[in-house]
Amino acid sequence: MMKRVELLSPAGDMERLELAVKFGADAVYVGGTQFGMRSNPSNFDPAQLQAACKLVHAAGKKLYLTCNTLPRSYELDALPDFLRSARAAGVDAFIIADMGVLAIAKQAAPEVEVHISTQAGIVNYAAANAFYQMGAKRIVTARELSLDEIKMIRDHTPPELEIEAFVHGAMCMSFSGRCILSDYMVGRDANRGDCAQPCRWKYHLMEETRPGQYFPINQEENGTYIFNSKDLCMIEHIPELVAAGADSFKIEGRAKSAYYTAVVTHAYRQAMDAYFAHPSPDFRVPDWVLAEMEKMSHRVYTTGFNFGPLQNGQELNTGGYVRNWDVCALYRDQQGNRLIVDQRNRFFEGDVLEVLEPGQKPYTLTVRDLVREADGTRTEAANKATEVYSFAVDRPVSPDAILRRKRDED
């Protein structure tokens, strides 16, 4: 029987954590109030972390805590208590990049698994084995590795050492995320969780002896995004990832929206389940699952370094996202043939909305008999942000349903 591969999803707050679990994650990774590589998301204070662990464990899933900054010496005094608090909350593993943090974790909370972060830059089996000897249960391979190189690590490490590989999300233009642009340009240290993402900004090229003369890099007069990476997407390559020996498929995006978390988790869950039900090197992702990859905010996709040196990993024309779909509403209640929803973006009488439910292929509903619940009046438009509306439906709708609409093409 083929081993089960874990699907690991990000969660920036409790709402995203709940959606990740409902839409199919086997495990989630979150950040605490300190020592995590994302300082901007809501993150989890000790009480929230305890509640998150309880929710995740009740669903039979796991929760991993990021402790993957590169802390300075003056920050270390707070680390043991932080780790002990996380252990008491019930986290299943710490994600760690720094060897000093690893040593402190083994002293402060020795029973908690340690996963070595991609920030550690593991690119060979000698490094993987060294971390295993230090007590690591899992390594997260550097994004710069090919699948052949991951397979080489798998072949030269103990089977007890798990291998986690990124399969989806944003990629850093610096090696394994070790960037100093943000610190240099705006004083925000990317290696301590505060990246301003200057790689996404627009740049011109100037030769130092010709100040004021800006040279074209691309056929655009407005500059070019020369540092800007595309987004990783490996959903069509599950057989290759499994053959390389990955034990866990990791999705990037703790700072992404709740909708993103739900859609990307659901898509990979459905693709993985379809593959493991009938494993074959010729496996093809169901068309409707593949279509989901275009229904969330993303940059142009790439397979990154997985198949060798990166040739077309930059997106030179824009630092922004492709956004073709809007979340219109979330399920609130259903009373008979009336679906009651919380509005998120405007929609109108007669609109055809697509409904995404956990474990199901999306289906459509037509908005009929639209009513504003606050006063019970009929309306042609649900255009008041966060208000409650209802409309007629002819089928039951899941309490976890997300209702969305494709943006009009102007």
Question: For the regions a protein language model found, what residue spans apply to each?
Answer:
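Gly/Gly-Pro- and Ser/Thr-rich, intrinsically disordered tail segments characteristic of DNA damage-repair
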Residues: 77, 111-123
